[in-house]
Amino acid sequence: MSDDKPFLCTAPGCGQRFTNEDHLAVHKHKHEMTLKFGPARNDSVIVADQTPTPTRFLKNCEEVGLFNELASPFENEFKKASEDDIKKMPLDLSPLATPIIRNKIEEPSVVETTHQDSPLPHPESTTNDEKEVSLQQTAQPTSTIVRPASLQVPNVLLTSSDSSVIIQQAIPSPTSSTVITQAPSSNRPIVPVPGPFPLLLHLPNGQTMPVAIPASITNSNVHVPAAVPLVRPVTMVPSIPGIPGPSSPQPVQSEAKLRLKAALTQQHPQVTNGDTAKGHPSGLVRTQSEEPRPQSLQQPATSTTETPASPAQPTQQTPNTGGRRRRAANEDPDEKRRKFLERNRAAASRCRQKRKVWVQSLEKKAEDLSSLNGQLQNEVTLLRNEVAQLKQLLLAHKDCPVTAMQKKSGYHTADKDDSSEDISVPSSPHTEAIQHSSVSTSNGVSSTSKAEAVATSVLTQLADQSSEPGLPQVGVVPPSQAQPSGS
């Protein structure tokens, strides 16, 4: 047995032997490809049936973290973390550029968010009594609450030794997002650092997508009053359904980002009352939609920050319309085949109907022709019978002197151009019968009527001869017979 299969598998617990090395290599490859999942969790319920179903396979892949190791363009900047860690992951804000903090009382100012001429609807949203940006004119530190338009990022707590920013997660519907800027009473200039600030975006469908927010500040000499923890949510209707990113280092548009933008484009934001906060002296938050330029968040007396709008926003309607065109063009194959078969059946039905009408017309025409043919055959048969009867009648009266006299007088006068033999010498009765037969058959119906007239006249003459016996003997005697009698 060992001589027939000399190649032994060296895997632990497997003692199979194979005839050649190729089979052994394939067998070893199966050992290498065997999936080895980690131990089951202690809190999971033990199920007796351990059949590897697709659901269990996906669950095991999630447990071992197979789906979290997908390649992304930001894998050098971020590390692998779970969803709970993403929501609570602290990031250091020390390299970020923040406004200069000074212990100075400032007057209330207006926070205005503009972004130029967008093809999307132009919602204007203002805050109400509870959603104001209030600045206190006291020596106590105050805080400024600013929410950029449609900034949709996960709940990330960003802390540093001097300031902290809390950005709440925004869902596709317009919700409140609060940015709390807290600063101590010390004055400290912060130098802006070039480059985008990375964040992890948690999409509503459960995926995680990294984004970059620019950290440049246009005005470094702005003043922010000393802050006291004052948190009031500012609700603004998003005018740009995208995530602002840097103008030059724009990341590659991934499929998840395009899906997110399409979902946000379909979302129709509700416009809140825009006249409630115009009379308040503390501040006014407005959102204007104009031409797609870099979106700037302007706070004249507090801070100034520019966040360029996403360049892919003005063309968001094009992929949707193209998708609708593709869906219209690419119909269901079953529906297309059903319509094709229906058209074929209708065409075949029309063809069968036309053929049926044509065949019926041919049958009717054939019946008419057959009936006409039968009538003609009957007429021909009757005519033949009549001709035969007339022939018999002529043969019966071939020796009649009246017939001979009528022939001499009638046929002689009618046929003057005939030979002299016919005029001088009377023809034989057989020849006369043949001539009568040929005339009657050639002339058809007219010859038949003529023969009837001749027969009628002959019968009349015979009747006259029977009533006057002396006359026919004298008048009917041929000259050949009269000469010998005279001699």
UniProtKB/Swiss-Prot annotation:
Record CDD domains: bZIP_ATF2 (cd14687), GCN4_cent (cd12192)
Record GO biological process: DNA damage response; regulation of transcription by RNA polymerase II
Recorded superkingdom: Eukaryota
Residues in C2H2-type zinc fingers: 7-31
Positions of short motif Nuclear export signal: 387-396
Keyword Cytoplasm: yes
InterPro entries found in the cross-reference section: bZIP, bZIP_sf, bZIP_transcription_factors, TF_CRE-BP1-typ, Znf_C2H2_sf, Znf_C2H2_type
Signal peptide extent: none
Compartment(s) where it occurs, according to its Swiss-Prot or TrEMBL record: Nucleus; Cytoplasm; Mitochondrion outer membrane
Family membership noted in the UniProt record: Belongs to the bZIP family. ATF subfamily.
Name the record gives this protein: Cyclic AMP-dependent transcription factor ATF-2
Origin species: Gallus gallus (Chicken)
